[in-house]
Amino acid sequence: MPQLNPSPWFAIMVFSWFVFLIFLPPKIMAHTFPNEPTAQSTQTLKTKSWTWPWH
């Protein structure tokens, strides 16, 4: 059963995890956002609710 022979696929799996864990996180974390998020105001809006005529 050739799928049980780990020599062809084990090195590929280890190398791909090496790429994922070593190279990709610094590249992803280096991205910057163009706009910093601002805090929303904590004021409550003074709007009246609209009653629906159910007749």
From Swiss-Prot:
Q: Which GO terms describe its biological process?
A: proton motive force-driven ATP synthesis
What's this protein's family per the entry? Belongs to the ATPase protein 8 family.
Q: How does it sit in the membrane?
A: Single-pass membrane protein
Q: Name one GO cellular component term.
A: proton-transporting ATP synthase complex
Source species, domain of life: Eukaryota
- Assembly and oligomerization: Component of the ATP synthase complex composed at least of ATP5F1A/subunit alpha, ATP5F1B/subunit beta, ATP5MC1/subunit c (homooctomer), MT-ATP6/subunit a, MT-ATP8/subunit 8, ATP5ME/subunit e, ATP5MF/subunit f, ATP5MG/subunit g, ATP5MK/subunit k, ATP5MJ/subunit j, ATP5F1C/subunit gamma, ATP5F1D/subunit delta, ATP5F1E/subunit epsilon, ATP5PF/subunit F6, ATP5PB/subunit b, ATP5PD/subunit d, ATP5PO/subunit OSCP.
Q: Supply the PANTHER family for this chain.
A: ATP SYNTHASE PROTEIN 8
Places the protein is found: Mitochondrion membrane
Q: What is this protein called?
A: ATP synthase F(0) complex subunit 8
Q: Which stretches are transmembrane?
A: 9-29
Identify the coding gene.
Answer: mt-atp8
Stated role: Subunit 8, of the mitochondrial membrane ATP synthase complex (F(1)F(0) ATP synthase or Complex V) that produces ATP from ADP in the presence of a proton gradient across the membrane which is generated by electron transport complexes of the respiratory chain. ATP synthase complex consist of a soluble F(1) head domain - the catalytic core - and a membrane F(1) domain - the membrane proton channel. These two domains are linked by a central stalk rotating inside the F(1) region and a stationary peripheral stalk.
